[in-house]
Amino acid sequence: MDTPPMQRSTPQRAGSPDTLELMDLLDAAAAAAEHRARVVTSSQPDDLLFGENGVMVGREHEIVSIPSVSGLQPEPRTEDVGEELTQDDYVCEDGQDLMGSPVIPLAEVFHTRFSEAGAREPTGADRSLETVSLGTKLARSPKPPMNDGETGRGTTPPFPQAFSPVSPASPVGDAAGNDQREDQRSIPRQTTRGNSPGLPSVVHRDRQTQSISGKKPGDEQAGHAHASGDGVVLQKTQRPAQGKSPKKKTLKVKVPLPARKPGGPVPGPVEQLYHVLSDSVPAKGAKADLPFETDDTRPRKHDARGITPRVPGRSSGGKPRAFLALPGRSHAPDPIEDDSPVEKKPKSREFVSSSSSSSSWGSSSEDEDDEPRRVSVGSETTGSRSGREHAPSPSNSDDSDSNDGGSTKQNIQPGYRSISGPDPRIRKTKRLAGEPGRQRQKSFSLPRSRTPIIPPVSGPLMMPDGSPWPGSAPLPSNRVRFGPSGETREGHWEDEAVRAARARYEASTEPVPLYVPELGDPARQYRALINLIYCPDRDPIAWLQNPKLTGVNSALNQFYQKLLPPGRAGTAVTGSVASPVPHVGEAMATGEALWALPHAAAAVAMSRRYDRAQKHFILQSLRRAFASMAYPEATGSSPAARISRGHPSPTTPATQTPDPQPSAAARSLSVCPPDDRLRTPRKRKSQPVESRSLLDKIRETPVADARVADDHVVSKAKRRVSEPVTITSGPVVDPPAVITMPLDGPAPNGGFRRIPRGALHTPVPSDQARKAYCTPETIARLVDDPLFPTAWRPALSFDPGALAEIAARRPGGGDRRFGPPSGVEALRRRCAWMRQIPDPEDVRLLIIYDPLPGEDINGPLESTLATDPGPSWSPSRGGLSVVLAALSNRLCLPSTHAWAGNWTGPPDVSALNARGVLLLSTRDLAFAGAVEYLGSRLASARRRLLVLDAVALERWPRDGPALSQYHVYVRAPARPDAQAVVRWPDSAVTEGLARAVFASSRTFGPASFARIETAFANLYPGEQPLCLCRGGNVAYTVCTRAGPKTRVPLSPREYRQYVLPGFDGCKDLARQSRGLGLGAADFVDEAAHSHRAANRWGLGAALRPVFLPEGRRPGAAGPEAGDVPTWARVFCRHALLEPDPAAEPLVLPPVAGRSVALYASADEARNALPPIPRVMWPPGFGAAETVLEGSDGTRFVFGHHGGSERPAETQAGRQRRTADDREHALEPDDWEVGCEDAWDSEEGGGDDGDAPGSSFGVSIVSVAPGVLRDRRVGLRPAVKVELLSSSSSSEDEDDVWGGRGGRSPPQSRG
């Protein structure tokens, strides 16, 4: 037996009409319809509702919709289901509804009438109330023509027999009737409450026009394919204003009819409506006592059980909203509806609604089915709930408080909506998690509270309700986290690239630029990232924004890009905003709040909403906010930190009353110290606290006062009786190495920053850096180590940050307060600059540079040489490689020996050190202290220090060294794009600027070197010049055919001594040719490669570039390579400067103060420019042409083209140039032969040369990389060489093989 529906009492809300008024409305409508059925005959042709072709004739047209009265065609709705609303969300959301017609919750009246009969046994009418359907499409029926004689009074319904069903074979209406009736409109009636049998108005105000109209059968068939045959749909709406579009998507309520006996008469609609609304259901065959047979029009009495909660229906575009009340249970379908489609049983009986006004019932997506969905409210046989229960949405605390006070609640007249309360249209929509066809993950929302809620400061970080975070469950063994919370992908631990990356990850102490979950141990990467964020000499914002994936990391990144699930876009959720940061699900699973710091810093770095300064402000704020979690000992979270900072323990009072026996108290304290002096054991680790500078320590940690009393108690004679005495336990075992500046000033030999007085070349350090101080005793213990040369130890006392780093690397000891350093190798590499020049007073020039990550003047580490990919090339930022290349007068490209990525050992700068040049990096130990110490030391000797700053202004370290204007300071940042091939990689080679470099006084190069050399000549006139831009200043250690660690350039004598003996007596000519480079290009990647080139200049000897002045502003030469004048491009294309370790740089001179780009004509340029240098080969050295090969395989052939070979007597008669004029490959009288040939060739002129029909020029042959390296292109065959041991060669044989009494040059056969 079905249980009666559950009764719920709901208070009257704004916008809901009174129940009595709704009953009166329905009774009056039924009485009016039945009254007209008796008066008017059924043969009236203008009956729109109950006539022969009326709306309610057939079972397909037994759906009456009040919006169709106005003749408006409702548009289809895309409907949506949302969260269940609370009682306070009942106010309608349309502004037009505030002054329009009231909403008639007709279904609530059904439920009220039905609930009154809950105590009795349910009857057929009760069981017929099966469901309430929302979103049913309106079906427009054909309208009969209107009688002209009844224009002013509307239509009259016939007797109830008009509701008898019509056979499907006889459809109602036809196309012609539809067209004829579509133009007809009925004139509505304007009535007031209780004085007319028409549709009454609930409120005493003007109502909008309503009319009755039919629907088209096609629309009905398309929109009601799933609806049952016997049912009544009622709807309340309003007619739009003049000029506005009709309202759409109103509520439609389908009320199933009571069961009838097969073959019996079908009751009319009014009778069926009466059966639903009446208190009792008539027996089978009995005549119903209809209310319109009496004249009683008084409102019916009913109990005060209230109306069930109403749920607003969603409507798109701010359309009127109706309200629906649901019956308590559902019943079996009507047995007579045999041809009606069977609906699927719903998964849940609970009714849900949507609170958004931007969509309607049904699917919220436009591409979903437009067919409305039916929501069941009960089970078919039992009243138990099926499916998942949905918790009601939380309501606002203010609204719930106002609902509690019934006496103070505002009494709103029914039919009107409140406009004094908050606008309910401004409300977010939460979609149902279990909605059919929409699988969404369970979400959570924070409670609405005005009181701030602070999460627990200890333990794992959980959700606000204490539950674990979504997706924190253990993963399967073959899956890793990827994408949104809870999603995973398949792991690839067995891939070779992943294995190699994991080996590098385990061996590295720095954060890897690309982290994938297969690497494992995310805590290691998080610790390294936190170390990077708090590192003072690193820029975490720049590194997180662009970690510069190169080599194996780039290949690994491309490998994982191919493994992305299909359909994912680039903006898909991946769980990490930057490649170095692990998936945030690892932090969520462990509940580690500190691991959110790298994610926050990476999000700031990747954001485009902030500039550089704003990003660093946010980064500094994050550092301060997470400092207590990252470094609890340094920020005072541990007792040891409170002791070292001088803060008393919160549990132990800092002051006590005077003890009458201080000696006894002192003895007690010596045996048992107080609680606030207890210390936690220090962790033995090399963590970020070790690498942070003093500045970070001071900013985050207020250190304790350095003046610690030696006595255990204060002397009784020095204190007042009224003051308590502070009892201390004497000095602690491990005091902080760096403290704040004493109030009485620092000691002369203490450790602090010596900022010179007066004007400075560099920015002034901050107050925190200047207040740092280290006692002389601590300095003596820290610097007493063989790692630090004695002459340079005072420089450490100028930098308290360096002292703090040394102290952090030394674990605490027993008798000795500072034990041996833990990172000996790291400290040795960072203080290697102290061994460049033994005596600080021998320093003449200080060159400051900012190395790229991975660049080190000590060379790569031996342990990581095989696995470390090396530094990343940057075309805009110059590091150590660009600085050394400029000092050695050569190009620096990723394929040359000058690039640090090709080094196998440390570069040799001893030639510069011998002339007093000191190279100092911004990452070196005591960088700031060294600059300030040298400035103070030389100033005290009445000497001026020369400083050449190659660091860009934006890369200058925070709180860097302060340099007085007494010294000479030149700022010239190192710029790789000063090389034309780097500035214009696509067109520089074709324009002939492959070896051109632009020189400027504000760029690290020959122009800025000239300023330093001029100042040096004025300050030290008796000393040898600096000679900064020379080929012999720097030597590199690279891998060549002579060995994996070859010092280049290798002199010709060393080449013959170490390379040739390996092929002495070799009969395999192919092996000999490959080993000696016979027939290969003379120069590969700007360095000597072939046998004849190595035997003449040395293996790895570099070609010299041509420098073009471009003024003070970098980039003034023009935005394109074609902007360089033609004559300058011709000169650079044909100029080939042979290697010379002592040659000066070739800088094209300006004319009358103008740069090379401003020559007026070719004659002016020809007169100002030097002769075009060339490489000339003596007879017997093979072909006269010189071949250059680039890293991409492109070959340049320099020599005569288009004619026969030069006569032998011409070659023999040409004298070889000496070292003084090697840059002039031609004599002055040869200018007309050489330069004119090149000039005419560029302009399409003559081709006069040394040989008939030939001209000197350059031919470019493009081949694949690595192809034809052992075969000459268009030249004579390779030379057969008979090798002899040259260990006893004389010094005169270093330059030439023949012509000076030595061995004769190798001759070619055939």
UniProtKB/Swiss-Prot annotation:
It is found in: Host nucleus; Host cytoplasm; Virion tegument. One of its GO terms (cellular component) is host cell cytoplasm. Residues 341-350, 1217-1227 have a biased composition (Basic and acidic residues). Residues 351-364, 392-407, 648-666 have a biased composition (Low complexity). The keyword Ribonucleoprotein does not apply. Phosphorylated by ORF66 protein kinase on Ser-686 and Ser-722. Also phosphorylated by ORF47 protein kinase and by human CSNK2A1/CKII. InterPro entries: Herpes_ICP4_C (IPR005205), Herpes_ICP4_N (IPR005206). Disulfide bonds: none annotated. Residues 117-271, 285-454, 636-696, 1195-1258, 1282-1310 are annotated as: Disordered. Encoded both by ORF62 and ORF71 within the inverted repeat sequences bounding the Us region of the VZV genome. Transcriptional transactivator. May interact with and recruit specific components of the general transcription machinery to viral promoters and stabilize their formation for transcription initiation. Negatively regulates its own transcription. This immediate early (EI) protein may be necessary in virion for viral pathogenesis. This is Major viral transcription factor ICP4 homolog.
